[in-house]
Design a protein with these regions (language model features):
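Negatively charged, low-complexity tracts enriched in Asp/Glu with abundant Ser/Thr
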Residues: 1-45, 83
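A generic structural signal for short, solvent-exposed coil/turn residues
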Residues: 31, 40, 52-54, 67
């Protein structure tokens, strides 16, 4: 599925240590039907895709420093109501944090 046309800037800001950034950039492939997310890194962007539908729900762009740490410099959330029923930007940011913490065991460095 393509990146959604209807999206909103999230203003998501995070700093990841080098080891954590590497984990995130390696992505995540669902292992079972219970896994609801597919996460991949492409052209400096991390994309969060619903594994069952293929819809892109969130994305954020990383600026990677020479030491390997990474800053989120742009972010968005899908606002196509046929693809994602958003509650709020705050809820979207919490969902991203929960996914990063749960899937990659990553804690932000900010």
């Amino acid at each position: 599925m393509p990146i959604p046309f209807e999206k909103v800037d999230l203003g998501y800001q995070k700093v990841f240590l080098a080891a954590d950034a590497k984990k995130i950039m390696s992505g995540y492939n669902p292992e079972s039907m219970d896994d609801r997310w597919f996460i991949y890194y492409e052209d400096s962007w991390v994309y969060f895709v619903r594994s069952w539908t293929g819809y892109h729900i969130f994305g954020f762009k990383l600026a990677v420093s020479p030491n390997g740490s990474a800053n989120v410099i742009a972010s968005w959330a899908n606002r196509n109501i046929d693809e994602y029923q958003a509650k709020s930007k705050e809820n979207d940011i919490q969902t991203i944090n929960d996914l990063i913490n749960g899937i990659f065991d990553v804690r932000s460095n900010d």
